[in-house]
Amino acid sequence: MKSKIIVALLIMNMVISASAQNQNQYGLVYRDAVSENVVGKVNIHPVSYEVGGIGVVANIYTPANYDSSKEYVAIVVAHPNGGVKEQVAGLYAQRLAELGYITIAADARYQGASGGEPRNTDRPANRIEDIHGMVDFISQYPGVDASRIGALGICGGGGYTLGAAQGDKRIKAVATLSMFNSGRVRRNGFQDSQINT
């Protein structure tokens, strides 16, 4: 009997979660996500561009009362390994826009809604290029002060963001959140376990 109740609760939870996700026209999955563009609030603008000949799909978040004739600091937000722009990267992009920044969260190439084959691959050099591509795109966005661009990398995106900032002087500030350096782990093993072997 208990197992039937547990199964029923799990099914009900999946249905409710799927229903909640379908209610958001942008596919955002976090609480209080932008669900429609409203004057005087943070708005979301789906965009697309190319990096290395492959289509990239992104969301730009503009602050409440955005005025393209003003100059705003911009922040690129890199998602975790295996993540997509609708998850934690979108949450941070929205919260930063609520603080007055213009932000961009993009699906890395080969992942999410962006193009590229084979799917669901995560190569450090590509992810670093993707961050450069976000900087390229956001620096041309109306209202962005291209001399004031920052970057936030989450989990694996944190390591890639540090790599991108090393070679891109347009990125003036970097922050990471729960950073994981995939490149270092691939070279040296987890916690540098392969260095002395």
Regions found by a protein language model. Give the residues of each.
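Alpha/beta-hydrolase fold nucleophile elbow
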Residues: P142-C155
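Conserved alpha/beta-hydrolase
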Residues: R95-G115
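Alpha/beta-hydrolase active-site loop
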Residues: T121-P142
